[in-house]
Amino acid sequence: MAKDSPSPLGASPKKPGCSSPAAAVLENQRRELEKLRAELEAERAGWRAERRRFAARERQLREEAERERRQLADRLRSKWEAQRSRELRQLQEEMQREREAEIRQLLRWKEAEQRQLQQLLHRERDGVVRQARELQRQLAEELVNRGHCSRPGASEVSAAQCRCRLQEVLAQLRWQTDGEQAARIRYLQAALEVERQLFLKYILAHFRGHPALSGSPDPQAVHSLEEPLPQTSSGSCHAPKPACQLGSLDSLSAEVGVRSRSLGLVSSACSSSPDGLLSTHASSLDCFAPACSRSLDSTRSLPKASKSEERPSSPDTSTPGSRRLSPPPSPLPPPPPPSAHRKLSNPRGGEGSESQPCEVLTPSPPGLGHHELIKLNWLLAKALWVLARRCYTLQAENKQLRRAGCPYQADEKVKRLKVKRAELTGLARRLADRARKLQETNLRAVSAPIPGESCAGLELCQVFARQRARDLSEQASAPLAKDKQIEELRQECHLLQARVASGPCSDLHTGRGGPCTQWLNVRDLDRLQRESQREVLRLQRQLMLQQGNGGAWPEAGGQSATCEEVRRQMLALERELDQRRRECQELGAQAAPARRRGEEAETQLQAALLKNAWLAEENGRLQAKTDWVRKVEAENSEVRGHLGRACQERDASGLIAEQLLQQAARGQDRQQQLQRDPQKALCDLHPSWKEIQALQCRPGHPPEQPWETSQMPESQVKGSRRPKFHARPEDYAVSQPNRDIQEKREASLEESPVALGESASVPQVSETVPASQPLSKKTSSQSNSSSEGSMWATVPSSPTLDRDTASEVDDLEPDSVSLALEMGGSAAPAAPKLKIFMAQYNYNPFEGPNDHPEGELPLTAGDYIYIFGDMDEDGFYEGELEDGRRGLVPSNFVEQIPDSYIPGCLPAKSPDLGPSQLPAGQDEALEEDSLLSGKAQGVVDRGLCQMVRVGSKTEVATEILDTKTEACQLGLLQSMGKQGLSRPLLGTKGVLRMAPMQLHLQNVTATSANITWVYSSHRHPHVVYLDDREHALTPAGVSCYTFQGLCPGTHYRARVEVRLPRDLLQVYWGTMSSTVTFDTLLAGPPYPPLDVLVERHASPGVLVVSWLPVTIDSAGSSNGVQVTGYAVYADGLKVCEVADATAGSTLLEFSQLQVPLTWQKVSVRTMSLCGESLDSVPAQIPEDFFMCHRWPETPPFSYTCGDPSTYRVTFPVCPQKLSLAPPSAKASPHNPGSCGEPQAKFLEAFFEEPPRRQSPVSNLGSEGECPSSGAGSQAQELAEAWEGCRKDLLFQKSPQNHRPPSVSDQPGEKENCSQHMGTSKSPAPGFIHLRTECGPRKEPCQEKAALERVLRQKQDAQGFTPPQLGASQQYASDFHNVLKEEQEALCLDLWGTERREERREPEPHSRQGQALGVKRGCQLHEPSSALCPAPSAKVIKMPRGGPQQLGTGANTPARVFVALSDYNPLVMSANLKAAEEELVFQKRQLLRVWGSQDTHDFYLSECNRQVGNIPGRLVAEMEVGTEQTDRRWRSPAQGNLPSVAHLEDFQGLTIPQGSSLVLQGNSKRLPLWTPKIMIAALDYDPGDGQMGGQGKGRLALRAGDVVMVYGPMDDQGFYYGELGGHRGLVPAHLLDHMSLHGH
C-alpha cells in the first residue's frame, strides 16, 4: 500500500485523530452487525431444529395415515364381503324358491304319469284275471262234462287223458301269466325306473339352493331304508310270482345304491368352490347310466354291492377343510309299527320308508313312486342341510376376520392421531402469532430514536430491521406452508382410501391387490418427501445467499461510497417510504368509504330488485283487473242493449195487451149479444123444425142430398177467391126474418175470413149439462162420408190462407148428435153426454186381467180422452183418443176434466143453433182441435176464443177479432197438434210458445235439488242445464229432474230447454227455455242409520231396537252437522230418543207404545242441531210380540181429570169410512150427571178456523173435480186453464208412492198457541186417538217436518189407488186431517163469548144425534175418580138436520165447505187485481161460507179469521141434513161424493155416566189373525152366470167398497171377509190394501 493511500473510511492513517469518530461509528456498526449475525445464526439453528422436529412429526403423521388407510381398507373390505355374502344368500334363497316350485311342478307331472301307468297296469291285470277265470270256467265245465271219469266203470286211459288235458291248460295258463304278462310288467317297471332316474338327474343337475334346515335325521328312519331288503328277499318265497318280485327288489336295491352315491357326490360338490360346482354335478350324474342298466337285471348280488358302495361314500359328505358335522334330523314322520309292514292289502299303509317292501309285493304299484319321492326328498333335504352348515361356517369365519382386522386399539390410535393433529395445528398457529409479535417489536425498537446516534446509523438500522422482518416472515411462513402440505397429504390419503375401496383391487384374493395398493401409497409418499426435502434445501440456500449479501455489502459500501451518498440515499428512501406510507394511508382512508358506499349500493340494488319484482306483480294484477273491467263493461253494454230491447218489447207487449183487453171487452159484449141472438133464433126455428120433422116422417120420403155439393164441382171450389155460404131453398122459406142477419155475416166474412168451428145445435138443452160441454170427435172415415149424411157443403178458402191448405177441401159430417131433422124422428131426442177425461196413469190392456184387451184403449198419463155416455156396469167408459182410436176406457185410470176447462179453447157462453159452413182448409184443423157438437171453436189468442155460431141453415153468426194472424196460424196449429203439443199452449198470437212453464224447485238440500216444470209437449225431450252447461237429457213425457252431487252453500242457475226435431226448428218459437236460480243449503241433514233391527228381549214386553250408528268424523258431525243422538219412530210417531251420537241400540217397553197392537214397522232417525235425518230402512216388528199381550179394554173416549196437562180423545172410527156412529137407543141426548153442557152438533168444532200453521199437504192425483160454471168471467176461465196445466204436471208423474210438489207454506204462522194437539194414528179397526198436550208448542220447522213425515207415510202407503175408486179413502184421510186440525183449534178460544153462547144453543130444526164431547182439562182443578167433562168444554156434535147456522150474526146463515186442493191467489188467480180480496187455503181445510156464488163463481168465506172470496170450483160443501140418507158429502161440481164413514161398521157408541163414550158390543180377546181393511178395485158379481153354481157364499163387490178381511188367502185365491153386515168369500185379486196410518 502507498503511504498516501487513504483508509477505507476516507481518513488518512497518518492522521488518526481526524478519523477516530468515523472509526468508532464503524466499529459500533461492525459490532452490531456481528451481534445481529450471531442472533441470526441462533435463529437459524432454532429453525433447523424446528424443521427437523417438523420432519419427524411429518413422518409420524404419514405412518399414522398409512395405518389408518390400511384399517379403513380392511373395514371396507369386510363390509364389501358381508354385503356380497348377503347378496349371495339372497340369490341362493331365490334360486331355492324357484327350484322348489319347479320340483313341485315336476312332481305333479310325474304323479300324473304314474297314475296313467297305474291305470294301464290295472287294466292289463284285469284282462289277465278275466282270461284266467275264463280258463278256469272252461276247465271246470270240461271236468263236469267228463263225467265218465268218475264212474266206477271208467278206464284208466280216459282218466290219464283228462289229467294230461288239465296239465296242458295249467301250463298254458302259467305261460300266459308268468311269461308274456310278467315280462310286460317287468318292462314297464324298468321303464318307470328309468324315468325316475332321469328325473332325479334333472333335479340334481339344476339344483343350486342352500336351505337352512334344523334337526337331525332319525337313525331309525335311516336304518329303515336298508333293513327291509333282507326281509323282502327272505319272505319272497311265499309269493306266487317270484320273478316279478325279484325284478322289483333288484331295481329297488340298485336305486338305493345309486342314491347313496349321489348323496355323497352332492355333499362333496356343495362343499367345494362355486367354480367347480357344475363339473362336480356332471361327474356325479354320469354314474346313473350303469345304475339304470343294472336295475333291469334280476340278480341278488346288487343289494350287497349297493351297501358296500354306500359305506365308502359316506365320508364324502363333508369337505376336507371343514370340520365334520352331525347329520340333521329328517323332516319325515316316524316309521309305522312293524305290524303295518305285514299288511299286504294296504298299499299305502304308512308314509314312512319301511312300508315300501310291502308295497312292492302287492300287485298295485302306486306306493312305489310315493316312497321313492319321499326318499329323494330326504336326500335333497340332507344335501341342503350340508350346504346350510357350510354357509353358517363361512359366516362365522367372516365375522372372526372382521373382528381381527378392526381391533379396539386401532380406534384408540385413530383418536390419538386426531388429537395430535389438533395440537400441531395449534402449535403452528401460535408460532405464526409469535413471529408477528416479534416483527412488531423489532419495528418499534428500530423506529425508537437512539440518543447520540447519527442519522446514517438510524437509516442502516431501519434497513436491517426491515430485512430481518422479511426474513422472519419468510421463516414463519415456512411452517404454515408445511402445515398446508400436511393437510394436502391427508386429503390425498383419504382420496386414495376411497379409490382403494371402490377400485377393482379389493377382490377376494387380497394377496394381489393389497401389495399393489400399499406400493402405490408408499411411492406417492416418497415423492412428496423428496419434494419437501428439495424445498428445505432451497430455503437454506436462499438464507445463505441473504447472509452472504448482508456481510459483503457494508464492506463494499465502505470502500465505494461515502457517507454523504449513503445519507442521501437514506433520506431519499425515507422520503419515498413516507410518501408511500401516506399514500397507503390515504388509499386506506379512501377504501373504507368506498367499501361502505359499495355495501350501501349493493343494499340499494337488492331493494331495487325487490321493488321491481313487486311492481311487476302489481302490474300483472292491475292488467288482469283492467281486462276484467273491460270484459264487464262489454257485458254491461250487451246487457243494456238486451235490456233496451226487452223494454221495447215490453212496451210493445203492453200496448198489444191493452188492445187485446179492449178487444176482449168488445168481444165479450158481442158475445153476450150473440148469446141472445141464438135464443131468439131458436124460437123462430122451432116451428120450422117441426115442419121439417113432419116432412121427414112421411113414408117414402127420399133422403135429401147436400144441395151445394151436388151443384158446385171441385174445380169451382178451388177456383173461387171468396167464401160462399149457400142456403137451401126451404131455409129461405122458413126463416125469412133472419135473412138480413145472414147477409151481414156474409159481408163480414168477405172482408176478413176466419176459421169457423163445426157445431151442432140441440133444441132443448138440459140445465144440468152446461152448454159449453164438448161432445164427440169425428174420425177420418166419418169425416169423409159427408156426401151421404151431410146437409150442408164446404166452401172455398179465403185469399189470405196458404195455397196448400186452401186447396184442401173436405166435407164435414154432422155429429152423431145433430138436429132433429137429421135424426129422422118425430121428436128431438136428448143429446148424449160428452165429457173430456184425462188419463192419470199409464195403462196397457194386454197386461191386465181382462179377457178382451183388444177392445180397450192403451192410455198414457196426461192424454185427453173424449168419453161418450155414462160408465157401464163393468166400470168402463166408451171413449176416443186424440188420434181417433175408439174403445173402452177403465174408469179407475182416468179423471174427468172440469166442464169449465177444455184444452185448446175456452168455453162458449151460449149454445149453438146449428151446423156451419167453413172456409176450405180449416175443417181439418177443426177436426183435430174442436170436435164439439154443442159449440164451435177457433184459435186461442191470449185466452180469447173465436166462437162461430150458426143460427140455422139460413143464418150464420160469426165473430171475428183478428183476421190475418189467425188465418195464417191455423195450418201451423194443425201440424203442431199432430206433433203432440198440448192444446192450451198451441194457440198464441204472433209467436208460439214451446218453453217449459212453471219451473220451480223442490227438496233443495246441501247436495241435491229437484226441479219440476210443465212441458208444452209430452212428445219432445228436454235438456237440463246447470250453470249454462248441459247436465242431462230427460226423455219425452218427463217433467222433473234431480241434481245430485252439488256443493253445499253454492249458488246455481238451472235452465230447462225443449229439444225439437229438425222439421219443427224452421218455425220461430220464441223462447224455448226457462231458467231458475237457487242456493243449496249449507250442510245437513245428517245421514240416517243403517241396518235397523227389531228383536224381542229376554224380558217379556220389551223390544230391542238396534242399528248401525251413522259414520261421523273427528268433530262428531255427519254431512256437516253435529250429531246429538237418535230418535226411534214407530209408524211415523216418535216413541223414544237416545242422546248419544254413538249409540247402537235401545229398549222399548210395551207401555211406551201408544197403540202397539197395530204398529208394524220401526225406523230410526239421526238427530242433530239442525234437525233430524230421513227415515232409515224400516224394520218389521216380530209378529209374535203382540200375541203375548192383550190390549187393555179402555173406553173409546176418555179423559183423566187428575192430570190437567194432557187429555186424550179416543173414539172408534172405521179406518175406511171415518164417520160418526148412528143414533143409538142407549145414547141419551142430555146427561144430568154431566157438568151442565148441552149437547151440540159434532161438526160445530169443525166450523171454527183459528189461526194455525199451514202444513204442506201434497196434492194427490185424486183431487176433487172442479164444478162447472155456467156463466163465468174471462179471468175465471184463465184460472181454470192454469189449474189444468198444474194438474198436467201432477198427473205426469208416477202414481205409485209419489209425492207431487206441494205449495210452499204461507207466511204469517201464529206462534201464540199455548197448547199442542197431536194425533197418533193407528191401523186398528175402529180407533183414532187424538192427544192434546198443554205446554209450549214445538218449533215451526220441527212441527212442519213431523207433519210432513206423517202425511208422506200415509200417502206412500196408499200406493196405487185409482182416483175414481179411492175417493172414499181420500175423503177418509181428508176427514182424518180435518179432525187433527180441529183438535188443535181446541187449545184456543178465538171465537169469543158470543159465539160460544151461540154454539151452546141447539138448532131447533136439527135432530139430536150421537155426540162426542171433547173436554178441556186445562181448566179443571179438582181431581175426580169419574170421567167427567170440564165445565167449559167444547162439544163436538154431528148435526143430522139442515145445514149448520153459523156466522158473524144471528141472522146470517153459514155453510161449511172443505177445500179440494191448495189455492194461492197470488200465483193461481186469473185476475191479479182481485187477488188481494181472495183467501189462501189448503187442501182439506174447512171454510165457513155465507150466501151463494157470485157471477164469477166465487163464495164469500172466512178462513184463518180473514174474510174474502174463494173459488167455488176448488171447494165442496159438507151437508149432513136429514134428506141425505146415505150420509155423503155433496160437492157442487160432482154431486154426491163417496161416503166419509158409515156408522153401521161400528158396534155402537153410548154415553155413560159422566159423558164419556164407551164401546158397545163384544169385548172378547182379539183374534190371533189381525183383520185387514181392503178396498175393491173392480166390480164383482158372483151371480152373473159365468160362475155357474160356484157363486154361492161369495159377496158382490162394487168398485170402492171397503171390505174387512179375516185370515189369510185360501188355496183358490179368496179371502173370507165382511161387507155391509154380510160375510162370505171375496176374490183376492180384486182387492187392494188400504190404511190410514201409513202402512
UniProtKB/Swiss-Prot annotation:
Summary of subunit composition and partner proteins: Interacts with LRGUK (via guanylate kinase-like domain). Interacts (via C-terminus) with HOOK1 (via coiled-coil region).
Name this polypeptide is given: RIMS-binding protein 3A
Record-stated family: Belongs to the RIMBP family.
Keyword Cytoplasm: yes
PROSITE patterns: FN3, SH3
GO molecular function annotations of the record: benzodiazepine receptor binding
Domain Fibronectin type-III span(s) in chain numbering: 995-1083, 1088-1184
GO terms, biological process: fertilization; spermatid development
InterPro entries recorded: FN3_dom, FN3_sf, Ig-like_fold, RIMBP1/2/3, SH3-like_dom_sf, SH3_domain
Function description: Probable component of the manchette, a microtubule-based structure which plays a key role in sperm head morphogenesis during late stages of sperm development.
Any single Pfam family the record assigns to this protein: SH3_2
Keyword Secreted applies: no
CDD domains: FN3, SH3_RIM-BP, SH3_RIM-BP_1, UDM1_RNF168_RNF169-like
Keywords (A to Z) from UniProt: Coiled coil, Cytoplasm, Cytoskeleton, Differentiation, Repeat, SH3 domain, Spermatogenesis
Main location: cytoplasm
Coiled coil: 21-143, 409-442, 480-619
PANTHER family: RIM BINDING PROTEIN-RELATED, RIMS-BINDING PROTEIN 3A-RELATED
Composition-biased stretches (Low complexity): 776-790
GO cellular component, one term: nucleus
Spans annotated as Disordered: 1-22, 215-240, 295-364, 697-811, 1251-1273, 1292-1330
Annotated SH3 domain residues: 832-899, 1452-1520, 1569-1636
Organism lineage: Eukaryota, Metazoa, Chordata, Craniata, Vertebrata
